[in-house]
Amino acid sequence: MSNVKLRIENIVASVDLFTQLNLERVIEMCPHSKYNPEEFPGIICRFDEPKVALLIFSSGKLVVTGAKSVEDIERAVNKLIQMLKKIGAKFSRAPQIDIQNMVFSGDIGMEFNLDAVALSLPNCEYEPEQFPGVIYRVKEPRAVILLFSSGKIVCSGAKSEHDAWEAVRKLLRELEKYDLIGEGEEEEW
């Protein structure tokens, strides 16, 4: 179990640029973008480097998604700010970036009988006709972990890598408590 790693699959952040934006001007500066105000009130902009998508609103608020690191989000926001400065946008202060959701994947390294897991663990759901994994909810830190019979996991809802690890540790402690994994294995994490 000591070789278990969590890999970031996606980070979603909300950003406030603290400025109003003229989206008709912004769309001219953003390659790989789409703006149809009758369908959606913002610009959908894609960057190749870093590889992210941005939703840009006239309020100066953004949603950045698809990032694999917090640094990617910061780089994308700074890249957009440099583009916006070219069309005369003024910024009263540094952007505020708030991580909304981080999604991680990982592998516990052993197979599970999901029926036994669902019958033993509190705070979980298992409807194999609807979804092939156990949905385990962690209250603090708030996160949802999907556990599959292969031992693969997906952790979503965490606001940081630390929170994701803490949520996974809680799942492992519960699995150990109900004798669903061997004792002591979780300690190697």
Curated annotation (Swiss-Prot):
PROSITE patterns of this UniProt entry?
TFIID
**Coiled coil (UniProt feature):** none
Q: Name one GO biological process term.
A: DNA-templated transcription initiation
Keywords, sorted A to Z: DNA-binding, Repeat, Transcription, Transcription regulation
Against InterPro entries, the record matches this protein to: TBP, TBP_archaea, TBP_CS, TBP_dom_sf
Disulfide connectivity for this sequence is: none
The sequence repeat boundaries are: 8-84, 99-175
Q: Name one GO molecular function term.
A: DNA binding
Q: Which residues cross the membrane?
A: none
> Its family?
Belongs to the TBP family.
Q: What is the recorded function of this protein according to its Swiss-Prot or TrEMBL entry? A: General factor that plays a role in the activation of archaeal genes transcribed by RNA polymerase. Binds specifically to the TATA box promoter element which lies close to the position of transcription initiation.
The protein here is known as: TATA-box-binding protein
